[in-house]
Amino acid sequence: MAKLITKNKQVFRDYEIIDKLEAGIVLQGWEVKSIRASDVNLKGSYCVFKANELYLINSYIGLYMAVKGDERQSRKLLLHKNQLRRLKQKVESQSLSIVPLSLYWNKKSKVKAEIALVRGLKKHDKREKLKKEETNKKLKKLISY
């Protein structure tokens, strides 16, 4: 796989992941330099449709040196038209959300975003998930002895 830049750990706790996709992301030069310096955070970010295009909202990319820009500006995600259509249809019909899971460098040194179609978990679902994880850990410990 490619080199991981950042991961949105909050998504794995708060959502049920239904489908994953790889998307390109439109960046300016200073944003790429900030990403190389690991000054990026996906916590609290999400994706929305604007005029049949998908945008990444509320992702933080720090300012590089003395550049004047917006750290939390919306960034366009690049997907094929059929992928966009399918995603939009699922979001509207099944009331799902789209969130970024991670940013990484691909083999051609391009920044890619891994996005996911997700459904929010309720509080009791999160508790059940934690209980299952704890019991699995205990079972693994018992098996290893």
Swiss-Prot record:
Keyword Transferase on entry: no
Keywords: Cytoplasm, RNA-binding
Annotated PROSITE patterns: SSRP
BP-aspect Gene Ontology terms: trans-translation
Pfam families: SmpB
SUPFAM superfamilies xrefs: Small protein B (SmpB)
Localization per Swiss-Prot or TrEMBL: Cytoplasm
Presence of the UniProt keyword RNA-binding in the record: yes
HAMAP family: SmpB
NCBIfam families found in the cross-reference section: PRK05422.1 (NF003843), smpB (TIGR00086)
Protein name as it appears in the record: SsrA-binding protein
Species of origin: Mycoplasmopsis pulmonis (strain UAB CTIP) (Mycoplasma pulmonis)
